[in-house]
């Protein structure tokens, strides 16, 4: 009896146990392991620029350290950085967010954690179009929500349609996660597509969590459009989420930010004050320089990403049994390996694309 009681008291969280480990990190670890063995491997797992953070941003951080800017800041970030983000929202996104509508976090994942903690009650549903960034459903589950996956197809350019969205809505729907430019497909929603989605969100009355982390990485004649900029009704229902990790090669600095209603921002700030307190003070100073300083390094990185995009897309499409849609944003190419399924390699039948990838990385 005592043992039974003791074992019950040591039981771990069912909520945490339901969360799946990150397969992205597993892929990255596999690539590093093979590199350590001396094999020539290029890791395509983690969404991380291979450039160093621009020098002017690093110098701003060094100055912050030397100036003693190493104390606590307000939990939701400094007014200086909020003002810089507010200006960026206005000029780049066409969005008016005052500083009290902005919450600065410890990276994009933290922003999403804040958002879903603030929005979700147990059992609330969050619609997530697939393919999706792997952390979305896990963060929703940790907040007590239920991920509702809506599969998109290659024929749809892997983009959610208003019709499919409306069909997925129930009386428990609390929010839609809309990621554009998209990780992992590289697809970009047009204004027409966004307006149709916004119409459903307004009519059915749910929030839109607009993950726009790759907003500055758009190619060709395409243009990034923020769904919150398409009218007051959708603006009021949207939490716009972005950060500096991808565009400024600052993945390790951990600065993300959101724009939302004052009510939601206040609640997210309160949540963050108890979970982590403020974002790194030095990284906040660096972020101010990133947003307000010279942008030439960003433009050079963008040009190099575009060059790689074209190269990767052509190489994949030239390979037998592989195909892809041309990515319009971010720095991903979503490979279609379905033609390989059912074929055999050294007597082993290939039944999934991950299995094919495992064979390639181990055999070649």
What kind of feature is each model-predicted range?
Residues 16:
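Substrate/cofactor-recognition hotspot
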Residues 72-105:
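Conserved N-terminal alpha-helix of the aminotransferase class I/II PLP-enzyme fold
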Residues 3-12, 20-22, 27-30, 34-41, ...:
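PLP-dependent class I/II
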Residues 53-72, 86, 91:
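Glycine-rich phosphate-binding segment of PLP-dependent enzymes
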Residues 46-49, 75:
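Acidic/polar N-terminal loop/beta-strand segments that form early-domain functional surfaces
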């Amino acid at each position: 009896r005592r043992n039974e009681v003791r074992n019950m008291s040591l039981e771990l969280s069912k909520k945490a146990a339901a969360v799946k480990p990150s397969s992205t990190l597993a892929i990255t670890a596999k690539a590093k392991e093979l590199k350590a063995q001396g094999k020539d491997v290029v890791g395509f797992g983690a969404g991380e620029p291979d450039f160093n953070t621009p020098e002017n941003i690093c110098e701003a951080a060094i100055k912050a350290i030397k100036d003693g800017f190493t104390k606590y800041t307000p939990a939701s970030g400094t007014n200086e950085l909020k003002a810089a983000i507010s200006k960026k929202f206005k000029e780049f996104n066409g969005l008016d967010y005052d500083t009290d509508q902005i919450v600065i976090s410890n990276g994009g994942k933290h922003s999403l954690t804040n958002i879903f903690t603030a929005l979700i009650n147990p059992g609330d549903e969050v619609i997530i179009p697939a393919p999706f960034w792997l952390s979305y459903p896990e963060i929703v589950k940790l907040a007590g929500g239920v991920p509702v996956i809506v599969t998109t197809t290659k024929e749809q350019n892997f983009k959610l349609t208003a019709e499919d969205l409306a069909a997925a809505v129930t009386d428990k729907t609390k929010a839609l996660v809309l990621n554009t430019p998209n990780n992992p497909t590289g697809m970009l929603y047009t204004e027409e597509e966004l307006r149709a989605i916004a119409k459903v969100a307004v009519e059915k009355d749910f929030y839109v969590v607009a993950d726009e982390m790759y907003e500055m990485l758009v190619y060709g004649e395409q243009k990034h459009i923020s769904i919150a900029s398409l009218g007051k009704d959708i603006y009021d229902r949207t939490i716009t989420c972005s950060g500096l990790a991808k565009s400024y090669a600052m993945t390790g600095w951990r600065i993300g930010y959101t724009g939302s209603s004052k009510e939601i921002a206040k609640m997210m700030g309160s949540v963050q004050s108890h979970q982590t307190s403020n974002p790194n003070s030095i990284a906040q100073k660096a972020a101010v320089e990133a947003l307000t300083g010279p942008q030439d390094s960003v433009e050079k990185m963008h040009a190099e990403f575009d060059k790689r995009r074209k190269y990767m897309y052509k190489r994949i499409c030239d390979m037998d049994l592989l195909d892809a849609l041309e990515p319009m944003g971010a720095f991903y190419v979503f490979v279609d390996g379905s033609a390989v399924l059912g074929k055999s390699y050294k007597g082993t039948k290939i039944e999934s694309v991950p299995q094919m990838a495992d064979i390639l990385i181990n055999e070649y």
